[in-house]
A protein has these predicted regions:
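Acidic catalytic patch
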Residues: 16, 42, 46, 65-91
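Residue-level detector of anion-binding/catalytic polar loops
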Residues: 37, 75, 111
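Conserved glycosyltransferase catalytic-site signature
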Residues: 7, 42, 81, 98-99
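General small-molecule cofactor/ligand-binding pocket signal
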Residues: 39, 77, 128
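Short, well-structured N-terminal submotif of metal-dependent ribonuclease cores
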Residues: 1-40, 53-67, 122
Length: 129
């Protein structure tokens, strides 16, 4: 089952954080083995850079970005018109980055790997944690 990741899940997997759930870890492991594809909204990479710049967690951003770029099983998704169209109707999501992530998941019809409690309550998307 292909899916889409949010920033926390991606960074916690990349840094081997104990904060990541077993289900999420399993999905990233399957992606590394080529069994599934994980889609990464461009805002997730931008947020990862912001986390790196602010030194909120320690990791090698260039290594993460290279791994995403070099992998056939991680797919970077640009923010474009169809995704922006979906964002217009998302009045119940206050954070811009979450709107972009949810809109991207809706556009691609994919579940989101996320620990975000607010996103988990939304009836119109599927989340995995």
């Amino acid at each position: 089952m292909n899916c889409l990741t949010d920033t926390h899940a991606l960074l916690w997997w990349f840094t081997d954080s104990p904060k990541i759930s077993p289900k999420a870890t399993n999905l990233f492991d399957k992606c590394e083995k080529g069994e599934i594809t994980i889609f990464i909204p461009s805002i997730v990479v931008a947020e990862a850079l912001s986390v790196f710049d602010k030194k909120r967690i320690s990791f090698n951003f260039k290594k993460l970005f290279k791994q995403i770029n070099d992998s056939e099983n991680f797919v970077l998704v640009a923010l474009d018109y169809p995704i922006l169209q979906k964002m217009v109707d998302l009045k119940d999501i206050p954070e811009l980055h979450d709107k972009i992530i949810v809109s991207t998941a809706m556009y691609l019809n994919l579940p989101i790997i996320t620990k975000d409690k607010h996103l988990q309550t939304l009836s119109y998307i599927k989340t995995i944690w």
